[in-house]
């Protein structure tokens, strides 16, 4: 057997170089190939798939987040316009109710004034009728007094 003695090593030591060295090299290459094909490639593929999955999920999440922010901004704009519209409607309703109140008040005042005027005219009419009646009674009474005085004389 051919053996090389490195650094004063004896046969059967750690660095024996003999016919088993090529066999060991072949075993290491075969083990590397087997481990690579059976373990490292599948694990690497799983890791790559997982990284792609995670990166796709991150990209999708960013897209959805930007979409949500856009929708939120749109909803805030719609909410603000709805609030403005509601305030406008409330303001119009208040103005309309004020207008109706003023119209009703004016109508009530007009009716009250008309009733008051009617009552005044009726009172004047009754007063005039009472004066006419009183005047007629006074005339009748004075005529009666004159007739009695004339008859007594």
Curated annotation (Swiss-Prot):
<dbReference type="GO" id="GO:0046933">
    <property type="term" value="F:proton-transporting ATP synthase activity, rotational mechanism"/>
</dbReference>
<dbReference type="InterPro" id="IPR050059">
    <property type="entry name" value="ATP_synthase_B_chain"/>
</dbReference>
<keyword id="KW-0472">Membrane</keyword>
<keyword id="KW-0793">Thylakoid</keyword>
<dbReference type="InterPro" id="IPR002146">
    <property type="entry name" value="ATP_synth_b/b'su_bac/chlpt"/>
</dbReference>
<dbReference type="InterPro" id="IPR034679">
    <property type="entry name" value="ATP_synth_b"/>
</dbReference>
<dbReference type="Pfam" id="PF00430">
    <property type="entry name" value="ATP-synt_B"/>
</dbReference>
<keyword id="KW-0066">ATP synthesis</keyword>
<comment type="subunit">
    <text>F-type ATPases have 2 components, F(1) - the catalytic core - and F(0) - the membrane proton channel. F(1) has five subunits: alpha(3), beta(3), gamma(1), delta(1), epsilon(1). F(0) has four main subunits: a(1), b(1), b'(1) and c(10-14). The alpha and beta chains form an alternating ring which encloses part of the gamma chain. F(1) is attached to F(0) by a central stalk formed by the gamma and epsilon chains, while a peripheral stalk is formed by the delta, b and b' chains.</text>
</comment>
<keyword id="KW-0812">Transmembrane</keyword>
<dbReference type="InterPro" id="IPR028987">
    <property type="entry name" value="ATP_synth_B-like_membr_sf"/>
</dbReference>
<keyword id="KW-0375">Hydrogen ion transport</keyword>
<keyword id="KW-0406">Ion transport</keyword>
<keyword id="KW-0813">Transport</keyword>
<comment type="function">
    <text>Component of the F(0) channel, it forms part of the peripheral stalk, linking F(1) to F(0). The b'-subunit is a diverged and duplicated form of b found in plants and photosynthetic bacteria.</text>
</comment>
<keyword id="KW-0138">CF(0)</keyword>
<dbReference type="GO" id="GO:0046961">
    <property type="term" value="F:proton-transporting ATPase activity, rotational mechanism"/>
</dbReference>
<dbReference type="GO" id="GO:0045259">
    <property type="term" value="C:proton-transporting ATP synthase complex"/>
</dbReference>
<protein>
    <recommendedName>
        <fullName>ATP synthase subunit b'</fullName>
    </recommendedName>
</protein>
<keyword id="KW-1133">Transmembrane helix</keyword>
<feature type="transmembrane region" description="Helical">
    <location>
        <begin position="23"/>
        <end position="40"/>
    </location>
</feature>
<comment type="function">
    <text>F(1)F(0) ATP synthase produces ATP from ADP in the presence of a proton or sodium gradient. F-type ATPases consist of two structural domains, F(1) containing the extramembraneous catalytic core and F(0) containing the membrane proton channel, linked together by a central stalk and a peripheral stalk. During catalysis, ATP synthesis in the catalytic domain of F(1) is coupled via a rotary mechanism of the central stalk subunits to proton translocation.</text>
</comment>
<comment type="similarity">
    <text>Belongs to the ATPase B chain family.</text>
</comment>
<dbReference type="GO" id="GO:0031676">
    <property type="term" value="C:plasma membrane-derived thylakoid membrane"/>
</dbReference>
């Amino acid at each position: 057997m051919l053996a090389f003695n490195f650094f004063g090593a004896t046969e059967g030591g750690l660095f024996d170089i003999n016919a088993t060295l090529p066999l060991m090299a072949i075993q290491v290459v075969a083990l590397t190939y087997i481990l690579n094909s059976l373990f490292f490639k599948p694990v690497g593929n799983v890791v790559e798939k997982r990284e792609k999955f995670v990166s796709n999920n991150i990209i999708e999440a960013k897209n959805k987040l930007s979409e949500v922010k856009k929708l939120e901004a749109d909803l805030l704009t719609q909410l603000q316009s709805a609030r403005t519209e509601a305030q406008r409607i409330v303001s119009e309703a208040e103005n309309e109710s004020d207008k109706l109140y003023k119209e009703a008040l004016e109508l009530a005042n007009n009716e009250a004034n008309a009733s008051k005027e009617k009552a005044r005219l009726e009172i004047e009419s009754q007063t005039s009728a009472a004066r006419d009646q009183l005047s007629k009674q006074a005339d009748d009474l004075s005529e009666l007094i004159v007739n009695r005085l004339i008859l007594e004389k």
